[in-house]
Each structure stands twice: as C-alpha cells, then as structure tokens.
C-alpha cells in the first residue's frame, strides 16, 4: 500500500515552478542563464506598503486574525470593487486567503463533488486542472487557438456544457497568453451562460491592472443577471509587486464564501496579519505605482513581440495585458539543433533552448496547447535584449 494518496497521483508538479527551479540550479552551478519563466514582477513592493507592514509589526499586530481576513482588509476590498468595478458587496461576501491560488483551491475544495465538471479554457494557468482534480472534479479542456486570439468561442463553450458542469474558469488578462476579453466578448459568453443557471463562473482577475493602450477592463460580475453565480478572484501580488506577501481575495455568493472559510479554518487559518495590513495600504493608498509599472511593461511587450516576429519560424500575437507572450514555435518543428537532436515538440524546443543558449522559457503544452512557448517579460530590458538575441541565434542555428 502506497503512503501517497490516490488523488495526489492524478496531478503533476507545477511546470512553471520546475522551469524556474531548473534555471536557479544552473545559475548556482555557474552557468549563465536568463530566466523568463517566472510569473512575478521584477519591481520592488512600493515603499508605502512596506512601511504599513513595519508599522503593523511595531504596533504588535502579530496575532491570529479572523480566519478569512480582518474586517479592515475586507472593507478595503469592498471599496476596491465599488471604486474600480462598480460592484456592490458586503464584507460577508468577501474572503481573504494566502494568495489567489489559495483562494481558487479553497473554492474548488468547497464546491466540487466527484464527477462535477469544470470548463477550463486552454491555454490555461497550469494549476487550474490539477486543483480541479485534487478536489475530485473533472477538468473539461476547451481549446482556444491563436486564430481566436486564444479566447473562448461562445458556440464551442455551449457545446462543452453538460448537466455535470459546475464551474467555468475565466482568466482575463490571461496567463499564459496575455489575451484580454472586451466587454463585448464577456457579454457574448454571458449570453451562453444565461441559458445554464446551474453553471457558476470563477473569474480570475489577478492581472486586472496589467493592461495596455487604453484597454478597458471588464469583469463578468458586472453583468447583473450573472453576479449571483460569479466568484471574482483578485489579489495584490501582480498589481503591487507583492507575490511573496501571499494575499489573494474573492467576492461572491455568501454560501460559497462561508464554505471557503470553513475549508480555511481547517487548513491554514488566517493569512499573515502583517501581509493583511500591507494589503490594506495597497488597496487604500496611492495607485500611482500601477500606472508607472504598466508603462514599463508595455515598452517591454512591444520590444519582445517585435523581436520574436523577426525570427524565422516564430510567430507572436500582440497581447493586450498581463506580462507574458505566447509565441508559436511550430515553424521550427522537424529541425535539428547543433547536437543533432530533432525538435519534435515544444518541450524539445524549450529544453534545447535552455541547454544550448541558457534561456529558460515554459513549453506551451504545460498550459494545454502544444506548439507554443511562454515568455515572461517581467524582467529588465537588459535581460530581455540578451535573451532575445540568444533565442534568435539559437533558432538560426537549427537546420
């Protein structure tokens, strides 16, 4: 009898974390590696937020809090939703967890029964399907190819819905593609979901504040007829460069929020009291950092997309948000690297690129779509220039 649970055997370690760890190991061994696999901003947390955390420590704010978040943080979250999304919530419709991933995991654990289906559009964030599996559910993968801009086709969505469908996960701006759903896109999806009142919607809005060129963010809870079926997840990690602080939150139906709190009460209990104090300042304080950072990301995106599209065999769409691009490497399949290894899959491409050129990216198949790779441009322009030169040279070396 194995000590490892059957449910754990269904899942795999996070590929994005694995790539980042591999890059670290190579660097530690003295190799020159540029890591473009990590999904975290390279900017420091703003000083006003750090000072709020220091004040909380000095004030002795170091005890347990309410399981699913302090009253003051929940109030700040309520105000955020009203101010930025024109959504009205009460504090008993808010939950706070140790990061957005934690909130989504809790939601799946709190709501899924064996055999319940969750529609996961691909390309997807790597953890969605495995969290569904851990909770006993069945992920239903809905492929969204580059011809669709990596976005859901409403007719294909409708074909994926069954009586067993409990959730659909929406992620805009998207990890890994940077694709963003316009208000019109969301309303088309809502038109389909309106026919199926048993389907709930988990909207992962963690990249809300990373959009470009005047893109107007719209979230599906803003459609009144669907709001009672929507759990809207967000957090401070990406917007305020607070990935290590581990604060995510969600707003939604009281029944689901209460169930999530029950799960959390028997697992992590409350998120860090210090991190919660910092998150209050992030949400209530100056928002100038967001605008400044978005400008930097847009410059990087423009450079990366242009450089990639100048490489024979690679094609890259121009994303409207997040800090990723998701280029195709299909034009390089069948070629051989300098060691004679034939590139048959995107995983072959990614491994050969790392081994031969010291650039770490993540294969598209890890996100549910073969023939692509993900680059995170959340690093310095200097690193990006070096990395793109290396990628270009590597591709030219293939024959």
Question: Which residue stretches match the model-derived regions?
Answer:
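PLP-dependent class I/II
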Residues: 2-4, 12-14, 19-22, 26-33, ...
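Substrate/cofactor-recognition hotspot
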Residues: 8
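Flexible nucleotide-interacting loop at or near the entrance of a catalytic core
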Residues: 61
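Conserved N-terminal alpha-helix of the aminotransferase class I/II PLP-enzyme fold
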Residues: 64-97
């Amino acid at each position: 009898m194995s000590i490892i649970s059957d449910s754990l055997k269904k899942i795999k370690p996070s590929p994005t974390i694995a790539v980042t760890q591999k890059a670290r190991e190579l660097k530690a061994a003295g190799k020159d590696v540029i890591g473009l696999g990590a999904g975290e901003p390279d900017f420091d947390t703003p000083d006003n937020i750090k000072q709020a955390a220091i004040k909380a420590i000095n004030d002795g704010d170091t005890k347990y809090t309410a399981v699913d978040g302090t009253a003051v943080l929940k109030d700040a979250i309520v105000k955020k939703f009203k101010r930025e999304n024109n959504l009205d919530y009460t504090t008993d419709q808010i939950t706070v967890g140790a990061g957005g991933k934690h909130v989504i995991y809790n939601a799946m654990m709190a709501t899924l029964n064996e055999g319940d289906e969750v529609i996961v559009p691909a390309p997807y964030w790597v953890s969605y399907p495995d969290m569904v599996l851990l909770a006993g559910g069945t992920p239903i993968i809905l492929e969204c190819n580059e011809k669709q801009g990596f976005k859901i086709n409403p007719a294909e969505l409708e074909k994926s819905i069954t009586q067993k469908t409990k959730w659909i996960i929406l992620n805009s701006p998207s990890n890994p593609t940077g694709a963003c759903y316009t208000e019109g896109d969301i309303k088309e999806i809502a038109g389909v979901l309106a026919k199926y009142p048993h389907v709930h919607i988990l909207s992962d809005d963690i990249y809300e504040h990373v959009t470009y060129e005047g893109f107007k963010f719209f979230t599906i809870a803003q459609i009144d007829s669907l709001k009672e079926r929507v759990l809207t997840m967000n957090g401070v990690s990406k917007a305020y460069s607070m990935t290590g602080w581990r604060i995510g939150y969600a707003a939604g139906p009281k029944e689901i929020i209460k169930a999530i709190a029950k799960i959390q009460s028997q697992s992590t209990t409350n998120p860090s009291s210090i991190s919660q104090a910092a998150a209050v300042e992030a949400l209530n304080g100056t928002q100038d950092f967001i605008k400044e950072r978005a400008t930097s990301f847009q410059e990087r995106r423009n450079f990366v997309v242009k450089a990639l599209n100048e490489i024979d065999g690679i094609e890259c769409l121009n994303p409207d948000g997040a800090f990723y691009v998701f280029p195709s490497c299909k034009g390089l399949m069948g070629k051989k690297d300098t060691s004679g290894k034939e590139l048959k899959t995107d995983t072959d491409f990614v491994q050969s690129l790392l081994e031969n050129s010291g650039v770490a990216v993540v294969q598209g198949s890890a996100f549910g779509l073969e023939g692509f790779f993900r680059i995170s441009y959340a690093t310095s322009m200097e690193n990006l220039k070096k990395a793109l030169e290396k990628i270009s040279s590597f591709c030219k070396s293939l024959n």
